[in-house]
Amino acid sequence: RMSLRPVLKTLAVVAALSTAALAAPASAQQKFVTIGTGGVTGVYYAAGGAICRLVNKDRAKHGIRCSVESTGGSVFNVNTIKAGELDLGFAQSDVQYNAVKGLSQFKDGGAVADLRAVFAVHPEPFTVVARKEANIGKFEDFKGKRFNVGNPGSGTRASMEELLTAMGWKLSDFALASELKADEHGPALCDGKIDGFFYGVGHPSANIQDPTTSCGAKLVSLTGPVVDKLVADKPYYAKVSIPAGLYPNNPQATPTYGVLATVVASAKTPADTIYAVTKAVFDNFDEFKKLHPAL
């Protein structure tokens, strides 16, 4: 299981800033809330749908109607919340941390001072998948291969870039660094267009299930001194193992590292909206967990 202690340091950083959000005045005009998620086949979209289903059950009481929006992922969601165009959104805990600190993808635009953590949802192991015929034994074997690094704006892409920097690699170290979205990398792998992909996701995931079932794709471990240093240095990372036999043709456990999926909002999001969403999830937590196996 994924140890949450290192990653929860991230949430503490943001949650410590969150009390202002709860003190914000309620807005009677706020009747619709939109949650930014990810691709339609991803866990964020399913988890967002689960949240909205629970919120909408009680809409007669609180007057708030919830809907999900498919987006480019974590970085996109944070930037769109900052722009006032989303009420809430999913974000990897590393993206959330970097946004608050003004690091990495947020260095040019500056810290997102109004970003607030609402709650954490599920662990997201970084999952590396290889084409069966590519003869990949470890991540370093992808050098000179065709590899999907994730679409710009996604948390997967942000985490991939941090790993490559730590390894001293550049995108040019791959024969091809494709930028496919999560629902595209599985078919591309099975069609022989890429040799592997990197994906931060809660498990089980349809985007991993499909290529392991359809073309015998293999999960590749992410371990070694570089990963050890990343986990030691970054408060939002923790080591995790993808269980043995979770996916077809992968009977062994796959050690890796990962983050937490979190729901974030702006300090400007009305407090009654945050309360209604949080109450809907935690008053119906057993039902929430049943709405997707990754929860």
Region roles according to the model:
Residues 1-13:
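Bacterial N-terminal signal peptides that target proteins for export
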Residues 11-21:
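Bacterial N-terminal signal peptides
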Residues 22-28:
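Sec/Tat signal peptide C-region and signal peptidase I cleavage site
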Residues 28-99, 107-108:
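N-terminal (or domain-start) structured segment
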Residues 32-58, 64, 124-191, 286:
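Bilobed "Venus flytrap"/periplasmic-binding protein-like clamshell domains
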Residues 93, 104-105, 134, 171-270:
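Pocket-lining segment of extracytoplasmic ligand-binding domains
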Residues 108-121, 126, 246-255:
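A structural signal for short loop-to-beta-strand junctions that line the ligand-binding cleft
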Residues 252-295:
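Segments of small-molecule ligand-sensing domains
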